[in-house]
Structures are given as structure tokens and as C-alpha cells.
Design a protein with these regions (language model features):
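Signature of dsDNA virion morphogenesis modules
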Residues: 1-158
């Protein structure tokens, strides 16, 4: 018996945004400066589809970070917003430059202290968030390179 099945796949359009998730900028944590050392050896890059949250609120996922890479001393993510109305409103704010800041939640896997500064030399990104005030002032949309901020629309099958 030869059963034949037909599957339809809808082609949708998705907008991807590139943003700097973290840099080696010192950030005050618990009264000490903390520096995330960023290189392919210090960041677990095999993590797939990190949740994108609204202001670190675990109950408010607004998208995903589909790819995380190291560019120089920056942790850069390719971000896709969810299709619900709330997430799309935040995406529009990003496009208009109203919401520009990003922040990450991460798990420290190894660190050391030198001259009163905590250096994190192994960590895993657990989530990224669109935030009004980031701990790392160099993290955000349009900060992954020196060119003007832009977004792109990519067609893909899923």
C-alpha cells in the first residue's frame, strides 16, 4: 500500500533585529564592579533560542534570541519578536528608537577577583530583555557595529 501525504507549509515574513546583549563594560553588582569577559571561550554559545523578555519579567516573553555570537568584545544577538499584539507594540517602539536598551540574565559558571573587581570568565546566557535602563550602558539595539541601526525582513519557512 502506497500512502501519500501532502503537507502545506506557510511562508511567513519575520523581522530580525541585531543588538548588543553585553560588553566588557564594568557593572556594579553588590558593591563591586563586575566584568563579563567576552570571547568564544567564556560564553556558552551553543544555547539555542534564548527567551526575550520584557524587563526581565519571566512571565512576559516577547520573543527569542535565535543566535548569539561574539563580535570583538561584544556579545551580539539576532532577535525575533513574537507575533502577539503586545510584543509587536514593543517591536514598533524598537523600530522608532523609543526602546533601545538590552540586558541579559546569566548564570556565572566561573569567576575570579582581581583588585576588587569580579571578572566572570565563564557564563551562560539565560535570557535577554528589552529594558528602560540597562546595567551595561553599551548594550542595546543598534550598538553591535558602527553603522546606523537598521532592521531587516527575512522570509523563511516554518
Amino acid at each position: 500500500m502506497n500512502d501519500e501525504h501532502t503537507f502545506l507549509m506557510e511562508v511567513r515574513s519575520a523581522e530580525f533585529f541585531e543588538g548588543t546583549l553585553a560588553t566588557e563594560t564594568p557593572v556594579e553588582r553588590y558593591g563591586q564592579d563586575e566584568v563579563l569577559l567576552i570571547s568564544p571561550k567564556t560564553v556558552e554559545l551553543h544555547t539555542k533560542d534564548v527567551p526575550l523578555l520584557d524587563n526581565h519579567n519571566q512571565g512576559r516573553q516577547i520573543g527569542i534570541v535565535e543566535q548569539i555570537t561574539v563580535v570583538g568584545k561584544k556579545l551580539v544577538g539576532r532577535i525575533r519578536f513574537a507575533t502577539d499584539r503586545y510584543s509587536q507594540e514593543i517591536m514598533e517602539d524598537v523600530k522608532e528608537g523609543i526602546r533601545q536598551n538590552l540586558s541579559i540574565g546569566y548564570k556565572v559558571l566561573n569567576s575570579f577577583i582581581e583588585n576588587g573587581t569580579v571578572f566572570v570568565d565563564k557564563f551562560k546566557v539565560l535570557e535577554a530583555s528589552v529594558v528602560p535602563i540597562p546595567a551595561d550602558q553599551n548594550a542595546g539595539f543598534g550598538r553591535s557595529n558602527d553603522s546606523n541601526y537598521s532592521f531587516r525582513t527575512i522570509n523563511f519557512n516554518y
